[in-house]
Structures are given as C-alpha cells and as structure tokens.
Amino acid sequence: MNNKNIGKILKTFVKKYSITRLILFGSRADGTNREDSDVDLIVEFSVPVSLITLSRIKIEMEEALGLVVDIVHGPITDDDMIEVNKEVVLYSVYY
C-alpha cells in the first residue's frame, strides 16, 4: 500500500478522535519500506487523549490498513528520545 492510500484511510480517523496532525515517519516516509512494513505515525490531537484511547486508535488503524501501526503521541520535541529522519505529513489542520 502506498503512502497516498495510507493517508486516505487514516484521514477517516481525524474527526472521530480530534486529530490535528498525522505524520508518517520511518521506512515508509523515507521509501525503504517493504510491502509488509509497519506504519510509524506521529499523531497530534486537539484534546487530551488517554493511553486507552491511543490503544483503541492503534487497533482500529491496524484493522483499517491491514498493517501493524506504531503510534507516537505528538508533538515531538528535541528532548524526546525518538529520532525522525524524514516526515510525510498525511494530514494537518495547520495548512
């Protein structure tokens, strides 16, 4: 599945979960993915989100995509212990 199709499917979650940004990173963002590679996402929200809700979102996204999804609650700062080499913004209210 290509990034455009992933973005189209994931945009269906925006309103339901008050998502303000969906950012793809990892192998799918830099083009080194295999067909079965996981989907690494930074997800930002307009409201506070519990770990239970994050888990529910992850499960629903995996079911919708048919791929493993890893979610990082954004925004990410320089102090966070995660390295993001390339980002592909799939959705943003800030455009």
Across the structure, where does each feature detected by a protein language model lie?
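Catalytic core of pol beta-like nucleotidyltransferases
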Residues: M1-I23, A29-E35, S46-Y95
